[in-house]
Amino acid sequence: MRKIYTSVDLGSDSIKILVAEIYNKKLNVLAVSNVKSSGIKKGLIVDANEILVSLREAISEIEGKLMITIDKVIASVPSYYSTFEIVTGEVDIDEYGKITGLDVVKVLQKAVKSKLKMDRELVTIIPIYYIVDDKKNIKDPKNLIGKKLGVKAMMATTPSKNVQSIISIFQSLGIDVVDVNLGSIADYNEFKNNTSDTGVSAVINIGHDITTVSLFNKGIIINSEVIQIGGKNIDNDISYVFKLDKKDSSKLKENFAVAHKKFSRVNDVKEAVTTNRDLISITQYDISQVVMSRLTEILKLAKKQTYLLTNREISYIIITGGTAELPGMSYLVEEIFGSNVKVGNIDTIGIRNNKYSTVSGLIKGINDKLESRDKEYTMIDLDNDASGQNKLSINDSSVLNKVFGYFFDN
């Protein structure tokens, strides 16, 4: 069975949709859409009708490219008021004594049972390690022999309204949300490596109007916070200083400015029309000074937030989000954070831009989740193959659906 997934990132500035296939453990882009959004502020839906218009446009673009109908998606949810709690569970293994993917699902279900509050929604549960009889620190228990299977896991939850509002938007379009995840976890899935998986790391996503700072310990999320500042504030600064409208300011930021004035050129000049209809000349140095000033503030606030989230030494920091694409960004972040920081670098053909880190990471995350449970699944069955012994067939009342929230309905 081909493993084809559709992921959606509902951002304040744009909606990103990715259809990709996992083949030989690599993500291959089949289609991608990026359209301007409206109806979302600070990462939260404020006008359902407006977001529906943008979402329809993005979906139609994907469907037109692939000549298919999108009816299932994975969606990112905002990190506002997310909580992370360590939970444990244990189940007995059947008479054969061989642990299966179903046993993994059962023990995770046991771990979260009765621990979810009424106003909270389970976003995901991430195994820290499994226990087979008396043996701890097992990463993959499948096919091992034992009488009992235990797990220590991190349960991530968010206010129910954060998830319900997103699901209802898709349902109104006849689309099922089969899985959700925090954008910060998706970002980590995109950029994780041996260094990040062995120590304390941070992911900083500079979005349009918010910046999300998340901490991970050996690949497991432990804390997250949202700062009310982002790329939009840079646009506002450019607009104020040069008396330009916001749209022109954004274009100049993305296509002309650099993140560090050290790498700007005084003789590189762009002409622009002000809100007073005056024609002015702007040097790359002048606009980059404005950009660098606000970027420095954002990065310093993010750095301060990492100290508030943990007192442990952070060994690895990843900067992502569309704003991270500005030329010279690596030099600026190293000045502020030191040598243990890197700007994200997506090398997948078709999505080589940090604004796609969340949609790409969502797909990598669900594929890892399914493999750990010994399941196969596709959202778009191009081969029309209904066979497959381990293909998921799950209804709303199933154990798996209860464990992972709105997971599968096929």
Features from the language model and the residues they span:
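Nucleotide/phosphate-binding catalytic cleft detector across ATP-hydrolyzing
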Residues: 1-14, 18-201, 245-246, 251, ...
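Extended, folded domain segments that form the structural surfaces/walls around functional sites
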Residues: 9, 193, 205, 304, ...
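Glycine-rich phosphate-binding loops at beta-strand->alpha-helix junctions
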Residues: 13, 259-260, 313-333
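Short, charged, surface-exposed secondary-structure boundary motifs
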Residues: 42, 190, 236-237, 349-356
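Short glycine-rich phosphate-binding loop at a beta-alpha junction
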Residues: 68-79, 309-323
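Short, surface-exposed connector motifs at secondary-structure boundaries
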Residues: 148-150, 217-221, 309-316
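Acidic, glycine-rich loop-and-beta core segments that form the ion-binding/anion-interacting portion
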Residues: 193-261, 265
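Glycine-rich phosphate-binding/hydrolytic loop that grips phosphoryl groups
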Residues: 342-388
